[in-house]
């Protein structure tokens, strides 16, 4: 029997990304609509909500309109409307403008910092009395005697290298819940345990993965075009390697630039990071970044298999 402190909730959500926070918000909305008292807790491994969100993003607001209909009056970070789209095929020195696929039309959409958006969602969740706890990493899934999930435990903090308790040691806690929602994102360590234990991949197609590398740049004012969106395919990747790029113009002379490569590439010498560096030297990209400076960067694994590769989403 564990001697960890225990806290009881109706629902525990693991991961304070857009999906986890949206789920928590909707649960509290439904509980109020039905005059039910529902306790909801969200834990996040980052030191603050949004700390581990690295994606620049373009958001289509239909789902947000349904979740928070009055979001425009709540000081949301959705400020920069998309103004124009370019979809380019790159050769080593030139760019060819291609017809923009319908699913990539962004009229009426907004360019956002996904990190700022999740921070704002956390504020909306807390306004509905969701308990949001950043800085707590779920390290263990809790099961009852019937092998049903009953919550998660957070990891101990302050252990020394040899595993003993240091002067600032804090023991983890057990969060027990009637329902637990795992919103860890791609390759979450608890999600992998659940997929194996409950055979959640049994009837779906094999998942494929990519890596997304993103940087935030401050560029010269003359190179800044807030609301402008560029996507590319082609160089520096060869035709047998899946991938492409995005470049989003934010406000305050900021540009979010990223490069995605499928991890099923065949060339063992290919380095996604170095391909990204080559990409930034293309004339079409160089003219935007020249004279600027990189102020932030990150990378993230991505699910690329599509809806047919999603695992079963419910389990005991």
Please describe what each predicted stretch is:
Residues 1-14, 18, 129-136:
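Glycine/serine-rich loop-strand microenvironments at binding/catalytic pocket rims
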Residues 95-116, 123, 151-153, 260-261:
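Helix-loop-beta segment of a Rossmann-like dinucleotide-binding subdomain
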